[in-house]
A protein has these predicted regions:
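Sequence signature of WD/YWTD-type beta-propeller architectures
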Residues: 1-295
Length: 295
């Protein structure tokens, strides 16, 4: 078995710390620690639970009791860290590596558990956004060797390509109004946050950091703020999104403006891949990591 020194993706010795950051108080709160890998929290629409993936499954954590329970997903047992809750809080869409070829495809299922429904037969497809009206999913997909952003009706059907720029375009997520999609793109050299209309028009660069590669811009429910994950330039290639890095969570106004660091942590992949804002827009959840046996 490869150890972490030889394989940057070796994570069997990861321990996970599920945390919440309060943007008004500027404080971090540890929700619960795990002696294994968990990733990518989503905050429930009623504010009572967090949902995360671990070992290919989706779990619910009750914020009052800190108890966890697995969401029954039948044959979908290889979920990655790209999953999103529906706007009505009744369903979850997940990205699952199918047994046939191991490639990620998007499925939806009841949040209470149930038999998943395949949405994207074409693969790989990695989910990131669900439109506020509940009708459309947005995702990153590799087609003919290019990773771009696509949308598809939530019931399935014909997918629509929104980006054509060379290089990785990833992490599409709707703003609360549903009129715009935030995403990250490497098209200008480093990974940066971008915004476009929901039909793919008016693609606009929102960060112009010369020292950072910025991933996964998540818009708060009130539409005022965006939290992003940033790697320092030189720590990896611009299109890489690795674990086991010293990274920063950074906040900026959704209208554009100064970007400020609010959290420094050890993590990266799995820390905040999907939207994790609380319904009141005052907090967001994330995962930091440590390697077992290391301080």
């Amino acid at each position: 078995m490869q150890k972490k020194e030889a394989d940057p993706w070796y994570r069997e010795e990861d321990e996970s710390i599920l945390e919440i950051y309060d943007i008004e108080q500027g404080t971090r709160e540890v929700v619960r620690e795990f002696d294994y890998l968990i990733e990518a929290p989503n905050w429930s629409m009623d504010g009572t639970c967090l949902f995360y993936n671990s070992n290919g499954r989706i779990f619910r954590l009750d914020l009052a009791t800190k108890e966890t329970s697995e969401i029954f997903s039948d044959f979908v047992t290889n979920c990655n860290n790209d999953h999103v809750l529906s706007p009505d809080g009744q369903s979850i869409a997940v990205s699952h590596g199918t047994k046939e070829d191991g490639k990620s495809r998007i499925y939806t299922l009841p949040l209470s558990g149930g038999v998943p429904r395949l949405i994207t037969p074409m693969a790989p497809s990695y989910l990131h956004g669900w439109s506020p009206d509940g009708k459309t999913l947005a995702y990153c997909a590799e087609r003919d060797g290019e990773y771009d952003i696509y949308t598809i009706p939530v019931e399935g059907g014909e997918e629509r390509r929104l980006t054509y720029a060379e290089g990785l375009n990833d992490g599409p997520e709707y703003d609360p109004a549903g009129s715009e999609i935030w995403f990250n793109s490497v098209r200008t050299g480093l990974m940066q946050a971008w915004r476009m209309k929901s039909d793919g028009s008016e693609q606009t660069q929102m960060t112009c950091d010369e020292e950072w590669n910025t991933w996964f811009p998540h818009v708060s429910p009130d539409g005022k703020n965006v939290v992003m994950l940033s790697y320092r330039k030189g720590d990896l290639k611009p299109a890489e999104h690795l674990p086991h890095k010293h990274v920063e969570l950074r906040l900026m106004p959704a209208a554009g403006g100064e970007v400020k660091t609010v959290v420094e942590l050890f993590g990266g992949q799995g820390t905040i891949n999907v939207n994790s804002w609380s319904p009141d827009s005052k907090k967001f959840a994330f995962v930091s990591y440590r390697i077992r046996g290391e301080n």
